[in-house]
Regions:
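Active-site region of the double-stranded beta-helix
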Residues: 1-82, 93-129
Length: 129
């Protein structure tokens, strides 16, 4: 698990559980330098509501964004003085909204996860080659 304490400023976090990894455009090859990261810019999901932007978008990006748009996700803004808990194996996309400083703490790994959201096994069986 990970705790993020925002000291100053604000950041937007989009969190998605392990069971959704197949919808998130995750790089699955262990030798790849961006292994377990997504190739998608989740900030572009809003472009799917604009027909002009959709026409300009490469088809592969549009298809992946449409798929990512169906994933279960939590969208929140963490502001100065707030703490965000990120469960083990959850994927997170972060956008700075202001100049900010944060403190992160990791504490162990929960391999079993949650009956509703999944855990480490969902990541290794569903996303990792």
């Amino acid at each position: 698990m990970k705790m993020v304490g925002m000291i100053t400023g604000a950041k937007r976090y989009i969190l998605s559980p392990p069971r959704e990894c197949s919808k998130l455009g995750i790089v699955t090859e262990r030798q790849n330098p961006i292994f377990r990261h997504s190739l998608l810019n989740f900030g572009h999901l809003v472009h799917l509501d604009d027909p002009t932007k959709v026409e300009e978008m490469p088809e592969e990006e549009r298809l992946w964004l449409e798929r990512a748009g169906t994933a279960t996700a939590l969208d929140t803004v963490v502001k100065a003085g707030e703490v965000l808990y990120i469960p083990s194996h959850w994927f997170h996309y972060i956008t700075s909204l202001q100049k900010s400083a944060q403190c992160n703490v990791r504490s162990g790994v929960d391999f079993e996860g949650d009956i509703h959201f999944g855990g480490g096994e969902d990541v290794t069986s569903g996303c990792v080659i």
